[in-house]
Amino acid sequence: MRAYWFDNKEGDQRELHDSGRDVDPEYLEKLGVLYYHFADEKDVDKLASDRSYKNRDVITVSPQKMGDVYEEKVKMFFNEHLHEDEEIRYIRDGAGFFDVRSEGDEWVRIRLEKDDLIILPAGIYHRFTTDDKNYIQAMRLFKEEPKWTPLNRGPEVDANPYRKEYLQTVPAIASQ
């Protein structure tokens, strides 16, 4: 895992967009983002048990697996959104980027690769893309039945109770 400030330059979302300014993992924790590196899936099983993740599935995001809908899906994943539950991803192969909003409403880019696990809190604005190799395989973990319901950023979603709860846990973001 490597986290850094997104450079906001034009170009393909799958490029690095590396500003050259790294972000410390402790800063991610301040935003509510948790990161682990697990070479053994048994460690993932323990985390799942400890955090009451009852369900999981595996998704492969690639042109070979998704065919003609790949580009459309990657663009959809890159729309800024939040979820009403945690987003947990354990990278089994390939690499990709999660971008999360900072307290200054800037993007922090988090590069994940094999054996990285990330937990995004409910209510955090974020987006996802593969890297320029166009391939990632990830285990998705869920507390309840598997679902992926993005709520795209806008005034209505800003008023969402899960967003408000997130803002209460991260006061620096709420004061924007």
From Swiss-Prot:
Entry similarity comment: Belongs to the acireductone dioxygenase (ARD) family.
Function: Catalyzes 2 different reactions between oxygen and the acireductone 1,2-dihydroxy-3-keto-5-methylthiopentene (DHK-MTPene) depending upon the metal bound in the active site. Fe-containing acireductone dioxygenase (Fe-ARD) produces formate and 2-keto-4-methylthiobutyrate (KMTB), the alpha-ketoacid precursor of methionine in the methionine recycle pathway. Ni-containing acireductone dioxygenase (Ni-ARD) produces methylthiopropionate, carbon monoxide and formate, and does not lie on the methionine recycle pathway.
Catalytic activity, as annotated: 1,2-dihydroxy-5-(methylsulfanyl)pent-1-en-3-one + O2 = 4-methylsulfanyl-2-oxobutanoate + formate + 2 H(+); 1,2-dihydroxy-5-(methylsulfanyl)pent-1-en-3-one + O2 = 3-(methylsulfanyl)propanoate + CO + formate + 2 H(+)
Protein name: Acireductone dioxygenase
Location (main, coarse): cytoplasm
Free-text comment on the cofactor: Binds either 1 Fe or Ni cation per monomer. Iron-binding promotes an acireductone dioxygenase reaction producing 2-keto-4-methylthiobutyrate, while nickel-binding promotes an acireductone dioxygenase reaction producing 3-(methylsulfanyl)propanoate.
Gene Ontology molecular function, alphabetical: acireductone dioxygenase (Ni2+-requiring) activity; acireductone dioxygenase [iron(II)-requiring] activity; iron ion binding; nickel cation binding
EC number(s) recorded for this UniProt protein: 1.13.11.54, 1.13.11.53
Record GO biological process: L-methionine salvage from methylthioadenosine; methionine metabolic process
Organism the protein comes from: Sclerotinia sclerotiorum (strain ATCC 18683 / 1980 / Ss-1) (White mold)
Name of the top EC class for this enzyme: oxidoreductase
Pathway entry: Amino-acid biosynthesis; L-methionine biosynthesis via salvage pathway; L-methionine from S-methyl-5-thio-alpha-D-ribose 1-phosphate: step 5/6
InterPro entries: ARD (IPR004313), ARD_euk (IPR027496), RmlC-like_jellyroll (IPR014710), RmlC_Cupin_sf (IPR011051)
Binding site for Fe(2+): H81, H83, E87, H126
Chain sites annotated for binding Ni(2+): H81, H83, E87, H126
Record key words, sorted: Amino-acid biosynthesis, Cytoplasm, Dioxygenase, Iron, Metal-binding, Methionine biosynthesis, Nickel, Nucleus, Oxidoreductase
Listed cofactors: Fe(2+); Ni(2+)
